[in-house]
Amino acid sequence: MKLLEGKTALITGAARGIGKAIALKFAEEGANVAFTDLVIDENGKATEAEIAAYGVKAKGYASNAADFIQSEEVVKLVKEEFGSIDILINNAGITKDGLMLRMTEQQWDAVIAVNLKSAFNFIHACVPVMMRQRSGSIINMASVVGVHGNAGQANYAASKAGMIALAKSVAQEMGPKGIRANAIAPGFIDTAMTQALNNDIRKEWISKIPLRRGGTVEDIANTAVYLGSELSSYVTGQVLQVDGGMNM
């Protein structure tokens, strides 16, 4: 039997990148997948079709995850159309890097809104559904910089540290209701963003990783499957650093 057979997963920011990889892996493991992105354009429709090709139900929803009302409306629609929400993955995220003295208020507010407030919005909307089910798994996508910080990314690091603390707090509050909450903290992952770096910077990063390679989106997706499935039924309030040993 597939690890996520019959479950419904809601993934934010999943039309591309890590979110898309998670959606496809979940579908491969039998989960029905609802996902959001700011717009569901041709790329989003293609992602929807790729997910559905695994023989599961799939639908993309256009939504600004940082908007409280829109998030509530999406969750209501997903519950009506899919019947349940068993797994929530808060993956929506952006970067607007800059050194502290050069960072604008807009850069700070935008990153906190998309990366952290969005997670609050969707958790707030999904928890009542999961409470009625007496089960649920919430996965916050954090980052190693949320654990250790990073110069030039004060806004991003703060948002990801917040994702970790949010997961731990929800785990404590919702554990008695059968709801688990954990965070994944990826390290240097090969995505479109990191591939845009010049080779010297990439080599420098990889030289600091004991496994001597960047991670793949599949590495993150496999970790999400573990946290979303019954394999991790006694795991909550934890942060899994998927970073090749970069931070120990």
Describe every region a protein language model picked out.
Residues 29-46:
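Conserved glycine-rich Rossmann-like NAD(P)H-binding loop of the short-chain dehydrogenase/reductase
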Residues 41, 62-74, 105, 218-219:
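The beta1-alpha1 cofactor-binding region of Rossmann-like NAD(H)/NADP(H)-dependent oxidoreductases
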Residues 99-100, 107-112, 194, 205:
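Substrate-binding pocket helix/loop in short-chain dehydrogenase/reductase
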Residues 120-123, 213-242, 247:
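C-terminal substrate-recognition "lid" of short-chain dehydrogenase/reductases
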Residues 123, 159, 167:
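Active-site helix of classical SDR
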Residues 128, 172-176, 233:
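Alpha-helical segment proximal to the catalytic Tyr-Lys
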Residues 143:
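Residue(s) in the substrate-gating loop at a strand-loop-helix junction
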